[in-house]
Amino acid sequence: MIDALTVCFEVTDRYHYDRICELDFGQTYDMYEFQLMRVEGRYYNNVYTIIYMDGDSQVDFGQLKFNIGKVANPNNLHDNGNPKVWISLNNQSLYSNDQYNLGFIATKLGLEPHNITTLDLCLDTPYNVSKPLRQLIKNKAVTTILNGTRVKDRDEDRAEISYTTSGSLNKDNKYMTVNVKQRNAIKDKSRGVTITTYDKLAEIVNSSGKEYILKFYGNPTKLFRTEVHLNNAEIKDYLDSRGLYFNYYMIDEALLENMFFYHLNSVIRFKYGKQDIVWEQLLGRAS
């Protein structure tokens, strides 16, 4: 399951691009099937909300953004000189068929896909994954393989692994989130793979309010998430090393699941004697 997606595009036809560049904040550019409304952005000088109508309902599909201006040495052009444009899908679009409108919207705007900038993959289960994961890490009889290396000194600090607990005043460890990162991602998740396991139902009820996710699953009473955050470098390396092609407009669930488990196991896995303990087992995909 995709939980976050940002795709970098190349402007191959500047007609609409040049016109939306002229919009002031709050102004709208009408593409008939959808609209672009310019809004304030944090890192990009040009940010537009993509809106279209579904019957009587207005759908916030995502954001189109370009012209990075608030970081050092921004790179806003492809090697051929064409402008870079990014589209980030609204989270709710990923839990409906709205995501399949990406190809139509990009084509209408004169954009060609270039690469995936960020991709969050997740698998939701009716059982808690954080607890058995922590138990495996703490079990002295189990060898932890962290970022491809067997951990020999169990007393050495491991900044790659962190635990966060929350809950009530009387029970502050009611919920536990486990984060495991590649070393390059410890300070900046844009530089490596990050794994997170947590109570998704509690997160929705207590903070995010993403009720559409619960509706997507039929309003379960228990929902736990395992999530992998990937950046362009990891995705490109994975695809190139296997001679695979990522279809930006038709999601290949088998490819995504293989990519998901590959990166989970590349960051952390376990061995008990001669037995491998991998994420496919933790998440119920293998016995």
Regions found by a protein language model. Name each.
Residues 1-286:
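Structured, helix-rich domain cores that form ligand/interaction pockets
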